[in-house]
């Protein structure tokens, strides 16, 4: 074997110098010496590094002043030691090469025994686990041939189970043994924590890596048992299921007892591409249910914020309740203004309410209960003025019977017709009371004929409408009217369930300084108690106090009973529905949700400028407007005033209601009016002391009214005052030119005679020649003889000049005129 082959063989097999005979013993000694030198060198290096690190760490902890100098000296000493050890290592390598050459020269054919490694049975690729570690090289063809040749010889004792190192062969000398025959770790004996491969330059974690390797080998040898995954048993499909729009495959999988992947696959087969988290629409869910052969029912959520729906459900439930009892009828008195509605109510209640009303007219809805013998009747008094149309409509909606008051001496009037229409639209029976029969000019037959034109036919004429002649002032016919009201109520069979949750309707609402938001409510079903959590329109709260129509506080309100309640967070609107909830938390959530919905509707109602309404918008913006901050005592009056102001028709001017509310005029109202240059109108309210002084300082005009038509007239006058003044030409005199003079620096002077009327120094003048207007201008100067005069009347001569005109001739006619302002109608 050549030297080159021997070197290759020794590198591949890792020479076992223990079994080499002859001079190879010297080779073993020299290799061991080299290894000892290297270990010693490596140990010194590691000790030097350790000492340097420990010294550096201790020095940094103690913060000695000369730490940097000591560290520098240690580094220099370490570099010197490393250089010396490198020289010793090179010398040892050279000595080893020389001894190897001598051994080859002395023996013509060195005996090299193959060291066979203990090979484990081959594992299949499927069984062999993946272990992180060094890459194992595939043996070369030369090594395979050598393995076959040596397999015939007796096997040598394996040196190690470690894989051959790729380092030079001189490092493959056997490890030194201790007295017990065990291999001891490299490095200094007795030192703990030294790496077993420190001489090969491995890191501090090599022990851990070796432990992992041994562990992995154990796992390789042990048979691997795969864990069996428990298969999910498919439960049977339900016959039907409830779904919500927006559910995904995971949600449906839980309901249908199927994997989401199966849902996705089935929809894919149906031509619908989805993933597990995609929200599904109604059609997709129903298509999936049809494919499975089951029924899909959409789940309907009840909107608790829809109190109108709750109100209707409660009313329907009360009709089928077993706890129904007879309730008092609700009677609304309607008619034209000054026909005696409130006077009739005063007669029934034995009060004098009409004497205390401003202007003698009712301007809000009043609710009262009157006991007739052993029966209670609830009366609603509605305004008769044209401005209170919405109030009359609300009164007709919550009533059971309408008593239509018509004055016998006045007959059917516009508000009478309107009241008839409201009652018919609400489907409420009408009882006609022809009032003021004590007047000399009373003519009930004429009134009956008028009402028959509106399909109100009396019973004696074959109709079904009850007619009663009364006098609210003297009390004539009042008992007959009450008997007919009770008879009509018995025919209607009015009942209610007092044990259910209360529902009602707001008759009026206002803001009281001492009580806060106050609402007059008519209870229609159930019983309202103090402390009940309620929602009223867009407001919510808990009933704090309840006061009846006589001013007494009560603990509960039964059906058909009008009460004044407090405890709301804001002033509700008239005709808002009242609903009682189980707890205050739910009531608050519903009230806040409704307030948010109302705000959203207001935003949606804002009209945006488009090409279609651009012209109307420009026209509206070019119009002048009267800005008003409106405050009233009750919500119904504020609503009626706002509607009346909007109906005022003055060409070129419109009313802009900046803010409308209830309660006293406060500082915020004055600040708002000052910022927007608006007028404050108060109806049955007064400004606070601070608001009054602030308005005086900022020059804000506050107008206070107690009669609605006076407020309407003043606003109309203000609108007319904002119009540009219009002028009309008026001829005031005629003159004839008798003589002319031309004067330098002055021009032509006309001597004229005033035929009729008069001429002034500020009047306009026209020069007419042969029936044609030659010039239209102004009088420049007017004199009589040598005196300047302001006016010359008919029958007198005068001299005058015309501005910028000198072509005046004898015989010309002069026409004097002036522009007069025309007041808007």
Curated annotation (Swiss-Prot):
Subcellular location: Cytoplasm
Bias (Basic residues): 181-191, 211-220
Location of the tr-type G domain: 326-495
Binding sites annotated in the UniProt record for GTP: 335-342, 381-385, 435-438
SUPFAM superfamilies according to UniProt: Initiation factor IF2/eIF5b, domain 3 (SSF52156), P-loop containing nucleoside triphosphate hydrolases (SSF52540), Translation proteins (SSF50447)
Region feature G3, mapped onto this chain: 381-384
Family matches, as Pfam families: EF-G_D2, GTP_EFTU, IF-2, IF2_N
Source taxon at top rank: Bacteria
Residue span of region G4: 435-438
Stretches for region Disordered: 1-239
Gene3D superfamilies the UniProt entry points to: P-loop containing nucleotide triphosphate hydrolases (3.40.50.300), Translation factors (2.40.30.10), Translation initiation factor IF- 2, domain 3 (3.40.50.10050)
Record keywords, A-Z: Cytoplasm, GTP-binding, Initiation factor, Nucleotide-binding, Protein biosynthesis
G2: annotated span: 360-364
GO CC annotations, alphabetized: cytosol
Membrane-traversing stretches: none
InterPro entries found in the cross-reference section: EF-G-like_DII, IF2_II, IF2_N, P-loop_NTPase, Small_GTP-bd, T_Tr_GTP-bd_dom, TF_IF2_bacterial-like, TIF_IF2
Biased amino acid composition, Polar residues: 194-208
Cysteines paired by S-S bonds: none
Functional note: One of the essential components for the initiation of protein synthesis. Protects formylmethionyl-tRNA from spontaneous hydrolysis and promotes its binding to the 30S ribosomal subunits. Also involved in the hydrolysis of GTP during the formation of the 70S ribosomal complex.
Name this polypeptide is given: Translation initiation factor IF-2
Organism, as annotated: Lactobacillus delbrueckii subsp. bulgaricus (strain ATCC 11842 / DSM 20081 / BCRC 10696 / JCM 1002 / NBRC 13953 / NCIMB 11778 / NCTC 12712 / WDCM 00102 / Lb 14)
Upper lineage: Bacteria, Bacillati, Bacillota, Bacilli, Lactobacillales
GN (gene name): infB
């Amino acid at each position: 074997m050549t030297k080159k082959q021997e070197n290759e063989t020794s590198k591949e097999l890792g020479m076992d110098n223990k079994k080499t005979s002859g001079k190879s013993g010297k080779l073993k000694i020299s290799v061991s010496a080299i290894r000892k030198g290297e270990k010693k060198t490596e140990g010194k290096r590691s000790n030097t590094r350790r000492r340097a690190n420990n010294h550096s760490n201790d020095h940094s902890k103690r913060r000695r002043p000369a730490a940097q100098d000591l560290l520098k000296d240690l580094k220099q000493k370490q570099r010197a030691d490393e250089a010396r050890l490198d020289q010793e290592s090179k010398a040892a390598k050279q000595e080893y090469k020389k001894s190897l050459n001598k051994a080859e020269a002395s023996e013509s054919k060195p005996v090299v025994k193959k060291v066979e490694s203990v090979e484990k049975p081959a594992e299949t690729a499927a069984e062999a686990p993946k272990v992180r570690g060094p890459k194992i090289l595939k043996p070369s063809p030369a090594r395979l041939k050598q393995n076959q040749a040596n397999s015939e010889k007796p096997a040598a004792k394996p040196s190690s189970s470690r894989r051959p190192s790729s380092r030079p062969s001189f490092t493959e000398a056997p490890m030194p043994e201790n007295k017990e025959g065990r291999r001891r770790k490299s490095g200094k004996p007795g030192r703990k924590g030294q790496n077993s491969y420190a001489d090969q330059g491995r890191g501090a974690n090599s022990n851990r890596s070796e432990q992992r390797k041994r562990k992995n080998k154990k796992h390789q040898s042990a048979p691997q048992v795969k864990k069996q995954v428990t298969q999910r048993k498919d439960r049977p499909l339900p016959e039907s299921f409830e779904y919500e729009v927006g559910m995904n495959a995971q949600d449906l999988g839980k309901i249908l007892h199927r994997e989401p992947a199966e849902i996705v696959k089935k929809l894919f087969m149906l031509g619908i591409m989805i993933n597990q988290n995609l929200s599904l629409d109604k059609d997709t869910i129903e298509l999936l249910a049809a494919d499975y052969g089951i029924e899909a029912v959409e789940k309907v959520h009840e909107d608790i914020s829809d109190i109108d729906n709750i109100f209707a459900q409660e009313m329907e439930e009360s009709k089928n309740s077993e706890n129904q009892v007879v309730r008092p009828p609700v009677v609304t008195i309607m008619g034209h203004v000054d026909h005696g509605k409130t006077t009739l109510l005063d007669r029934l209640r034995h009060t004098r309410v009409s004497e205390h009303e401003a202007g003698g007219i009712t301007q809000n809805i009043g609710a009262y209960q009157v006991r007739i013998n052993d029966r209670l009747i609830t009366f609603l008094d509605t305004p008769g003025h044209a401005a209170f149309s919405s109030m009359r409509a609300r009164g007709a909606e919550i009533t059971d019977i309408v008593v239509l008051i018509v004055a016998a001496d006045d007959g059917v009037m516009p508000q009478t017709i309107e009241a008839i229409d409201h009652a018919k639209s609400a489907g409420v029976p009408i009882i006609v009371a022809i009032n003021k029969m004590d007047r000399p000019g009373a003519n009930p037959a004429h009134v009956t004929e008028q009402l028959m034109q509106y399909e109100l036919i009396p019973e004696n004429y074959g109709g079904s409408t009850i007619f009663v002649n009364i006098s609210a002032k003297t009390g004539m016919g009042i008992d007959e009217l009450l008997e007919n009201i009770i008879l009509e109520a018995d025919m209607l069979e009015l009942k209610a369930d007092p044990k259910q949750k209360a529902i009602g309707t707001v008759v009026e609402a206002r803001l009281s300084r001492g009580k806060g938001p106050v609402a007059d409510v008519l209870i229609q079903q159930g019983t309202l108690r103090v402390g009940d959590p309620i929602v009223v329109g867009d407001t919510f709260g808990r009933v704090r106090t309840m006061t009846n129509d006589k001013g007494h506080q009560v603990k509960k309100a039964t059906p058909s009973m009008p009460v004044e309640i407090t405890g709301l967070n804001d002033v509700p609107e008239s005709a808002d529905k009242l609903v009682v909830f189980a707890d205050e938390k739910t009531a608050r959530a519903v009230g806040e949700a409704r307030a948010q919905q109302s705000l959203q509707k207001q935003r949606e109602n804002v009209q945006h400028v488009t090409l279609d309404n651009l012209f109307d918008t420009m026209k509206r913006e070019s119009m002048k407007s009267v800005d008003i901050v409106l405050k009233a005592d009750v919500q119904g009056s504020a609503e009626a005033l706002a509607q009346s102001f909007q109906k005022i028709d003055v060409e070129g001017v419109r009313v802009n209601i900046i803010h409308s509310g209830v309660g006293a005029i406060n500082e915020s109202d004055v600040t708002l009016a000052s910022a927007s240059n608006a007028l404050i109108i108060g109806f049955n309210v007064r400004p606070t002391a601070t608001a009054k002084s602030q308005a005086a300082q900022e020059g804000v005009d506050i107008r206070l009214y107690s009669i609605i038509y006076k407020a309407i007239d003043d606003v109309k006058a203000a609108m007319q005052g904002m119009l540009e003044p219009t002028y009309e030409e008026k001829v005031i005199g005629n003159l004839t030119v008798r003589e002319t003079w031309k004067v330098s620096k002055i021009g032509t002077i006309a001597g004229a005679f005033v035929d009729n009327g008069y001429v002034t120094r500020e009047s306009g003048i026209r020069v007419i020649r042969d029936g044609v207007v030659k010039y239209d201008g102004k009088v420049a100067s007017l004199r009589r003889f040598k005196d300047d005069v302001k006016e010359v009347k008919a029958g007198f001569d005068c001299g005058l000049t015309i501005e910028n005109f000198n072509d005046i001739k004898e015989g010309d006619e002069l026409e004097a005129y002036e522009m007069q302002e025309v007041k808007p109608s």
